[in-house]
């Protein structure tokens, strides 16, 4: 973050040549617009609501982040619809290796629990994952070694905050049911 607290500056040698000012880029799953571009450095304006709702306010110099360009129309979709509209940040309860894979358990904030479903989709720091366990106050996903090596999941630990985006389809279903419910 810059000293103004409303801009995020990142050095992105692989991504920077492929984006321009005005393009959307997901940073830890949060959709941001490139507002400045100089060489390998990208600048993003960050709203206060975004800082309040995400883990971006906790970033420090050299913090690893997940970066991803917006999906182009016609490009293959390899996961679920991730929009970059973070619902909340949630605390990592545990991150443990089991055999060759990794189990990540994350706190499930009560305000969002109705969006979580066993075998449903969720994005954590922008990574499309499947809810493998739905517990009373948390959920767990399994991480394969490739995902761990190629994302910032490799750097998280119990107590860290991750960005969580629940499946948009659950939100649309909720909205449709609310509109079709009889009104008193």
Identify the function of each model-found stretch.
Residues 1-184:
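Conserved loop->alpha-helix
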């Amino acid at each position: 973050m810059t000293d103004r607290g409303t801009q995020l500056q990142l050095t992105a040698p692989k991504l920077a040549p492929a984006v321009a000012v005005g393009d959307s880029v997901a940073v830890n799953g949060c959709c941001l617009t490139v507002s400045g571009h100089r060489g390998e450095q990208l600048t993003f304006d960050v709203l206060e609501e975004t800082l309040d709702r995400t883990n971006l306010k906790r970033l420090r110099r050299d913090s690893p982040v997940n970066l991803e360009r917006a999906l182009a129309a016609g490009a293959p979709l390899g996961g679920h619809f991730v929009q970059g509209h973070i619902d909340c940040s949630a605390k990592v309860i545990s991150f443990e290796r089991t055999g060759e894979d990794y189990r990540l358990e994350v706190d499930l904030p009560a305000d969002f629990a109705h969006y979580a479903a066993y075998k449903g989709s969720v994005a954590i720091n922008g990574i499309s994952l499947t809810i493998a366990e739905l517990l009373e106050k948390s959920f767990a996903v399994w991480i394969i070694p490739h995902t761990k090596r190629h994302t910032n999941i490799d750097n998280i630990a119990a107590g860290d905050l991750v960005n969580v985006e629940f499946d948009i389809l659950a939100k649309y279903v909720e909205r449709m049911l609310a509109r079709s419910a009889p009104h008193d």
